[in-house]
Design a protein with these regions (language model features):
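Short, charged amphipathic alpha-helical "coupling" segments at sensory-output junctions
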Residues: 2-13, 120-121
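PAS-family sensory domain signal
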Residues: 9-54
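PAS and PAS-like sensory modules
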Residues: 21-23, 77-87, 96-97
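Glycine-biased flexible loop/turn sites that connect beta-strands or occur in inter-domain linkers
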Residues: 29, 89-91, 105-109
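Terminal output helix/cap of sensory domains in signal transduction proteins
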Residues: 60-84
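Short loop/turn elements at sensory-signaling interfaces that couple input to output
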Residues: 96-120
Length: 121
């Protein structure tokens, strides 16, 4: 099961290389965000931290993303959204795709989220 999830992550990031990436583990709270050059923009282990506030995402966008994530399932793993955020001191519109990771061992939701973000052209 862990090997399947790792392969799913590798395949997702390979298909979406050249963009900023997000990797979040729900059980540990470990979050890593990398920029296009694969440099760490943000890393944390505190599950109580408000990531959206850190990147200046407005409340409406936060609720929209949370609502979309709530609708994901083993069959419907991905969501897409366009949000305004501040990354590396640059506030602009970003499109993001989030892919939820699931395990048969956890019945009540996803075990992680991976994703990418890129500026809206």
């Amino acid at each position: 099961s862990i090997l399947r999830v790792m392969k799913e992550k590798v395949d997702f990031f390979k298909a979406n290389s050249g963009m900023g990436s997000i990797d979040y583990n729900t059980s540990s709270g470990q979050l890593t965000i990398l920029n296009r050059k694969q440099q760490i923009l943000y890393q944390r282990n505190n599950p109580d931290f408000d990531l959206f506030k850190e990147f200046g995402v407005n409340e409406e966008d936060v609720h929209h993303i949370q609502g979309l994530l709530h609708q994901t399932s083993v069959q419907n793993k991905e969501i897409s959204a366009t949000i305004k955020a501040t990354v590396e001191n640059n506030s602009q519109m970003y499109r993001m795709k989030l892919h939820t990771l699931w395990s048969p061992l956890k019945k009540d939701g996803y075990i992680g989220i991976i994703g990418y973000f890129d500026t809206v052209k």
